[in-house]
């Protein structure tokens, strides 16, 4: 198993990354979904004890990916935030990330948890529903646009691999759509059938089981 897996989709080369991200080399674009900044803060605000440091860890992972792939842009496919702006811990971590990557263009397609996104002033461009960049349409929830392959998040796909530790995050890869795993490590998951096309993220490596519409390169 490798840390990256390149495959062909609609005539474009895409690269799945073991740290739950997708890279489009032709655009130098890093794509993630479901970052859920502040989720731990929201849980603690509600009286639920969870460890601190999750947001900073996720943003450190993201920073490493931006640098490793020399990305010129970052697209976040929804649920960048997790609910209301209840704490400042995540904000300090985000501001540090943004300062570190000041020239990085960041587009966020708003998700169902992003109600506070517009007033958060995070130095990002917000797309309210989806954005078309042929041959793909980028959205939070899978979008149907004629002639375009949907790339989305929201579902937090996981696949059950008992021999490799049980349920693991995965990319869901079909003829007409790619669903990204949740980038945040602090999320649940929606099961993908073993017979479907997927690329599993297993302990820093990738295990592909491709659908017909995607071809490894």
Positions of predicted regions on the chain:
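Extended recognition/assembly regions associated with phosphoester-bond processing machinery
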Residues: 1-217
């Amino acid at each position: 198993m490798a840390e990256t897996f390149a495959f062909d989709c609609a005539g474009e080369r895409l690269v799945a990354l073991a740290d739950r991200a997708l890279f489009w080399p032709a655009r130098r674009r890093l794509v993630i979904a479901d970052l859920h900044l502040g989720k731990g803060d929201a849980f603690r605000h509600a009286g639920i004890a969870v460890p601190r440091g999750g947001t900073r860890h996720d943003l450190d992972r993201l920073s490493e990916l931006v640098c490793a792939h020399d990305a010129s842009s970052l697209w976040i496919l929804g649920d960048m935030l997790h609910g209301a702006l209840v704490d400042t811990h995540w904000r300090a971590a985000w501001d540090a990330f943004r300062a570190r990557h000041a020239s990085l263009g960041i587009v966020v397609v708003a998700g169902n948890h992003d109600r506070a996104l517009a007033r958060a002033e995070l130095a990002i461009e917000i797309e309210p529903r989806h954005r078309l960049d042929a041959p793909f349409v980028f959205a939070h929830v899978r979008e149907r646009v004629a002639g375009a392959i949907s790339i989305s998040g929201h579902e937090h796909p996981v696949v059950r691999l008992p021999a490799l530790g049980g349920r693991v995050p995965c990319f869901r890869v079909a003829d007409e759509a790619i669903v990204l795993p949740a980038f945040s490590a602090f999320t649940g998951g929606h099961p993908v059938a073993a017979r479907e096309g997927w690329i599993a993220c297993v302990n820093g490596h990738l295990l592909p089981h491709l659908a017909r519409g995607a071809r490894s390169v």
